[in-house]
């Protein structure tokens, strides 16, 4: 078992990483929650696989448990889904002294976290991430949000969980496409903060070799994010480097209506494309983009897509949350393991 402590001024919490942790979820929940009712928000796929077993596991600790399931996919992370969830919480008579659990990948984590932050002006919640992307990235750091038609994550808040429970063995039910999706974020961490991690990923013989070491990889990624979040909780400085590849990535997701490329796949393309642009402008060490592209391809990720002359891409970039005071902050690399913030305008991409 590995435990990381996220230490923040107003709220601190543990990230627990352990194979087969799902058999002990109820026990761990009891260490941070002494109320009566627990509402689990998940999606239909995960509910079919884990819902009943996890519900019983938590009930065995004396809690009253309700499972609320949504349609899988990014389109559930929208305002149209919220009233249905709020009404089910009201039917369950959930109070501010009760608990919400986010059981799922990045979409469920963002959605359930947003519900927790807004229902009755705020209810405690726990993250139980089940996808690689959520385990290494989105479950840590307190960002919760829903999408608007004009862009991703445009309405949200910073709302930290009481606890993050990560069972790497739950990745065994994850479709390969979404394992690759998470690898996009894993590679990002190596790019921005850890040359050692990047080279470790280069050194694995293949994806199966990586999977045998997945617990260690998850720990390294969470530890990097923990350090960054502790230094810049509200995303006004250093934390922006975590968005390497995301400016173009979010635009790609939006252009394809969230149906072709998953978040991690789009970020992978964004990292490759922006590194090539930066090299052409002598803002990134020559050869960096080639190494990134090679590593992405090694793990089955796309590296390019045509978004030229697309007005929607330009508008999506303008709405990027790293835009401050009329300027666009893009995340570039000096070299592998050295991400930095570069102040520019949308014309950078033209």
From Swiss-Prot:
Its EC number is 4.2.3.4. GO terms for molecular function: 3-dehydroquinate synthase activity; metal ion binding; nucleotide binding. It comes from the Bacteria. Keywords: Amino-acid biosynthesis, Aromatic amino acid biosynthesis, Cobalt, Cytoplasm, Lyase, Metal-binding, NAD, Nucleotide-binding, Zinc. It is found in: Cytoplasm. It is an enzyme of class 4 (lyase). The keyword Metal-binding applies. NAD(+) binds at residues 106-110, 130-131, 143, 152. Zn(2+) binds at residues 185, 246, 263. One of its GO terms (cellular component) is cytoplasm. Belongs to the sugar phosphate cyclases superfamily. Dehydroquinate synthase family. Catalyzes the conversion of 3-deoxy-D-arabino-heptulosonate 7-phosphate (DAHP) to dehydroquinate (DHQ). This is 3-dehydroquinate synthase.
């Amino acid at each position: 078992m590995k435990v990381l402590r996220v230490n923040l001024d107003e709220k601190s919490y543990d990230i627990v990483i352990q194979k087969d942790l799902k058999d002990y979820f109820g026990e761990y929940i009891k260490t941070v929650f002494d109320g009566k009712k627990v509402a689990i928000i998940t999606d239909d796929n995960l509910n079919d696989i884990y819902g009943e077993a996890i519900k019983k596991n938590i009930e065995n600790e004396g809690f009253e448990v309700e499972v609320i399931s949504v349609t899988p996919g990014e389109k559930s992370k929208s305002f149209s889904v919220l009233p249905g969830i709020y009404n089910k919480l009201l039917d369950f008579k959930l109070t501010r002294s009760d608990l919400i659990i986010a059981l799922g990948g990045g979409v469920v984590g963002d959605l359930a976290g947003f519900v927790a932050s807004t229902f009755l002006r705020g209810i405690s919640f726990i993250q139980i991430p089940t996808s690689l992307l959520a385990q290494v990235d989105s479950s840590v750091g307190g960002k919760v949000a829903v999408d608007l038609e004009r862009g991703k994550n445009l309405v949200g808040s910073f709302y930290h969980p009481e606890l993050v429970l990560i069972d790497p063995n739950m990745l065994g039910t994850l479709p390969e496409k979404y394992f690759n999706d998470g690898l996009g974020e894993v590679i990002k961490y190596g790019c921005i903060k850890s040359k050692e991690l990047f080279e470790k990923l280069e050194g694995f013989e293949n994806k199966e070799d990586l999977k045998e070491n997945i617990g260690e990889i998850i720990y390294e990624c969470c530890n990097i994010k923990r350090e960054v979040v502790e230094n810049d909780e509200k995303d006004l400085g250093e934390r922006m480097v975590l968005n390497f590849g995301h400016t173009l990535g979010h635009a790609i997701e939006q252009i394809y209506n969230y149906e072709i490329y998953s978040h991690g796949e789009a970020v992978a393309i964004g990292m490759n494309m922006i590194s090539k642009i930066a090299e052409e402008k002598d803002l990134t060490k020559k050869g960096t983009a080639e190494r990134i592209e090679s590593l992405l391809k090694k793990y089955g990720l796309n590296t390019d897509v045509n978004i030229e002359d697309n007005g929607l891409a330009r508008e999506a970039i303008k709405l990027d949350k790293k835009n401050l005071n009329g300027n666009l902050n893009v995340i570039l690399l000096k070299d592998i393991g050295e991400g930095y913030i570069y102040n520019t305008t949308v014309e950078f991409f033209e």
